[in-house]
Curated annotation (Swiss-Prot):
Cleaved by caspase ced-3 in vitro. One of its GO terms (biological process) is regulation of cell fate specification. It comes from Caenorhabditis elegans. Residues 296-440 are annotated as: Involved in sequence-specific DNA-binding. The gene is lin-14. Disruption phenotype: Asynchrony between gonadal and vulval development. Retarded uterine uv1 cell differentiation. RNAi-mediated knockdown results in the precocious onset of tail tip retraction resulting in over-retracted and shortened adult male tails (also known as the Ore phenotype). RNAi-mediated knockdown in a ced-3 and ain-1 double mutant background reduces the percentage of animals with developmental defects including impaired egg-laying and production of ectopic seam cells. RNAi-mediated knockdown reduced the number of dauer animals in a dcap-1 mutant background. This is Protein lin-14. The keyword Transcription applies. Changing G381D: In sa485; alteration of vulval-gonadal synchrony. Residues 163-183, 193-214 have a biased composition (Polar residues). The keyword GTP-binding does not apply.
Length: 539
C-alpha cells in the first residue's frame, strides 16, 4: 500500500474468523455468543486511533443489525418466493399494487444509505474485504441463504435440528429471475471516493442506480432520512402480514387443507294450494288413494247382522256366487254334514272348539260356498288380504247351524263367540289351502301336457281323457268325398255285367253280386283304417 494512503488495519485471524462466523451463523439462524475479547477495539485498529476503533465496533453492531434484518426478511419471504409471481393479480384486487417489490424491499432493508459523519476529522472505516461479496450483491446473498438454509434445501444439507422438515421447493419463475440478477455486476464505491465533509468527488460519478449500492458505515446517528426507512419497515411488515393472511385464506401453504363442511339449509316447500304442487313435479304412476280401514274382526261384522231364525231361513243356500263360480257344484244336505260330525269316532274326545272348527269347514266347502269360491275369497278384512271376503250371508248361516248343534256345550254367549272367531280363522286358512291346491293341480296338469307334447311332437293340452291317455285325433270327412251306398253299387254292377259276354257256363247273378259286395266292403274298410290313427294302449 502507498505511504499517503491510510494504513490498512492489521486484522487478526480470529477477528476474520469472527466476521465469517457472524455472517454465516446469521444466515443459518443461529448467533454465537460474542465475548469481550472478541469485541476488543484494539484488535480492529492499530492501537493509535481509538476513535477509529470505536467506529469499527459500532460498525460491527450495525452489521449484526443488518444481518438480523436480512435474516427476518429472508425467513418470511423465501418460503413464499416460488408462489410470489403467481399471486400478483390477487393482491392487485386487494389494493396492494402500490407496495414495493420484493427485490426493492430487500435492497432497501439491506443496503440503505446511512448518515455520514459530520465531523471532518473522523474518516469512515473501510468495509472488511471478507464480507464485501456478500453485501455487494443482494441476489448473491439470497442465493447463499437458499443454499445454506436447511428448510429450503433439505435434499442437499442435513437440517440443524431433527424436528425441522426436509422440505424442497421446486424451481419457479421467481428463483430464475433472482438467479439472472446474480450475473449482473454491481459496482462497489469505496470510502475513498467520499471526502471528509460527506460529499462525493468528481472521480466517483455514478448513476442513480449505483448510489443505492453505497454502504457507508456511519456512527449510528439518526438523520431525517430514517423516517423513510421506518415507513418502509412498516410497509414491509404490513405486506408480510397481508401475505400470510392471503396465503392462509387461499390454502397455498397447506398441501392438504381441511375443507369446511357446509350443511345445506333444509328445503322448505309450501303446502299445495288449490291442487297445485308449487312447481314440484309429481312422481310417475297412478295416484294412490288411501284405503279406508276395514274391520277385520268377522265376529263384529256377523253380530251386527240380523241373526234371527226367520231371516236366516230366507237365505239362499248355497250362495249364488258359489253356483256362478262353479256351475257343477252340487251341495250336500245340512243333516248329512251334521251326522258326519256327530257320528265321528273322535266326536266325544274332541273339545267343543275343535268340533265347531270341523263343522264350519265342512259346511263351507260342501254346502255353502264350494271349493271354487273358497279359492277366490277369504275370511278377513281388506287390510289383511288382497282377496275379497266370503259372502256374509253364508257365514251367518254357518253361525246359525253351529249355534243349533253346539250351543249347549258352551258356558256363556261370549265363550261361543270366542270359539266362533277361532273357527273363522281356521276357515280362512282352509281357503288358502284350497287356493294352493288348485294352483298345484293346475301346474301339474300343465307339466303333464308339456311332457306329452314334447314326446309326440304336437301340442295337445286338452286331448287327455280321465285316465291320462291320449285320445285319438278324429279327422272330419270332407263333404266332397264320394261315399258309395248300396243303390249306387248295385247300379254300377248291373251296368258292368251288361257288357260282359255270356258264356256257356253262366254263373248266377246273385253269386257274382255277393262276391263283388264283399270285395268292395274290404276295400272301404281298408281306406277308413288308413285315415284314422291306431288305438294306443294304456301308458
Amino acid at each position: 500500500m502507498g505511504k499517503g494512503q491510510p494504513k490498512e488495519p492489521k486484522i487478526e485471524q480470529s477477528v476474520v474468523d469472527l466476521c465469517k462466523r457472524t455472517v454465516a451463523m446469521n444466515l443459518l439462524q443461529c448467533y454465537p455468543t460474542t465475548t469481550v475479547d472478541e469485541m476488543n477495539c484494539e484488535e480492529w485498529g492499530n492501537g493509535t486511533e481509538s476513535t477509529q476503533s470505536v467506529a469499527a465496533c459500532q460498525g460491527c453492531i450495525e452489521l449484526r443489525k443488518e444481518v438480523t434484518d436480512l435474516r427476518q426478511a429472508v425467513n418470511l419471504i423465501l418460503p413464499m418466493l416460488p408462489l410470489y409471481p403467481t399471486i400478483g393479480n390477487g393482491f392487485n384486487a386487494t389494493g396492494l399494487a402500490a407496495q414495493p417489490t420484493l427485490q426493492h424491499v430487500i435492497q432497501q432493508s439491506l443496503l440503505r444509505k446511512r448518515p455520514v459523519a459530520q465531523t471532518p476529522t473522523v474518516p469512515q472505516p473501510e468495509c472488511p474485504g471478507q464480507i464485501r461479496p456478500v453485501l455487494s450483491s443482494p441476489a448473491a446473498a439470497l442465493q447463499n441463504v437458499i443454499m445454506l438454509n436447511p428448510w429450503i434445501m433439505g435434499s442437499s444439507l442435513k437440517p440443524a435440528s431433527p424436528t425441522l422438515p426436509n422440505g424442497q421447493i421446486p424451481t419457479t419463475i421467481g428463483e430464475t429471475s433472482l438467479q439472472g440478477t446474480d450475473d449482473q455486476t454491481v459496482k462497489w464505491i469505496g470510502p475513498s471516493s467520499v471526502d471528509s465533509n460527506g460529499q462525493k468527488t468528481d472521480s466517483s460519478a455514478a448513476s442513480a442506480g449505483d448510489n443505492q449500492n453505497i454502504d457507508v458505515i456511519g456512527d449510528g446517528s439518526e438523520s431525517p432520512t430514517s423516517s423513510n426507512h421506518s415507513a418502509q419497515e412498516i410497509a414491509l411488515m404490513t405486506s408480510q402480514q397481508t401475505f400470510l393472511n392471503a396465503l392462509k385464506d387461499s390454502s397455498f401453504l397447506f398441501t392438504n387443507p381441511v375443507p369446511t363442511v357446509e350443511t345445506a339449509p333444509p328445503l322448505r316447500v309450501a303446502p299445495p294450494i288449490n291442487g297445485t304442487t308449487n312447481g314440484t313435479a309429481k312422481a310417475g304412476g297412478p295416484e294412490r288413494k288411501p284405503r279406508k280401514p276395514v274391520n277385520d274382526d268377522i265376529v263384529k261384522i256377523v253380530r251386527n247382522q240380523d241373526l234371527s231364525e226367520e231371516n236366516i231361513s230366507m237365505f239362499e243356500i248355497p250362495v249364488p256366487k258359489a253356483i256362478a263360480s262353479d256351475p257343477t257344484f252340487r251341495p250336500v244336505s245340512e243333516q248329512q254334514i251334521i251326522q258326519q260330525i256327530i257320528q265321528g269316532k273322535k266326536y266325544e274326545e274332541m273339545e267343543v272348539g275343535e268340533c265347531m272348527i270341523q263343522l264350519c269347514k265342512k259346511l263351507a266347502e260342501k254346502r255353502v260356498f264350494g271349493p271354487r269360491l273358497m279359492s277366490q275369497t277369504t275370511v278377513a278384512g281388506l287390510n289383511h288380504s288382497n282377496y275379497a271376503n266370503l259372502p256374509i250371508k253364508g257365514i251367518c248361516y254357518i253361525q246359525h247351524v253351529c249355534r243349533k248343534v253346539l250351543y249347549d256345550k258352551f258356558e256363556n254367549e261370549e265363550d261361543f263367540w270366542d270359539k266362533f272367531r277361532e273357527a273363522m280363522r281356521k276357515l280362512a286358512a282352509r281357503c288358502r289351502r284350497v287356493r294352493h291346491a288348485k294352483k298345484t293341480k293346475h301346474n301339474r296338469e300343465e307339466a303333464q301336457a308339456e311332457m306329452l307334447s314334447k314326446r309326440y311332437g304336437e301340442d295337445m293340452p286338452f286331448n287327455l281323457n280321465g285316465a291320462g291317455l291320449i285320445r285319438p285325433k278324429v279327422e272330419t270327412v270332407s263333404p266332397e268325398a264320394n261315399i258309395l251306398n248300396s243303390d249306387q253299387i248295385k247300379s254300377q254292377l248291373e251296368s258292368l255285367f251288361a257288357h260282359i259276354p255270356k258264356t256257356e257256363s253262366e254263373t248266377p247273378l246273385i253269386e257274382i253280386i255277393q262276391q263283388n259286395i264283399s270285395l268292395f266292403t274290404h276295400l272301404i274298410r281298408t281306406k277308413v283304417e288308413s285315415q284314422s290313427p291306431p288305438l294306443q294302449g294304456p301308458q
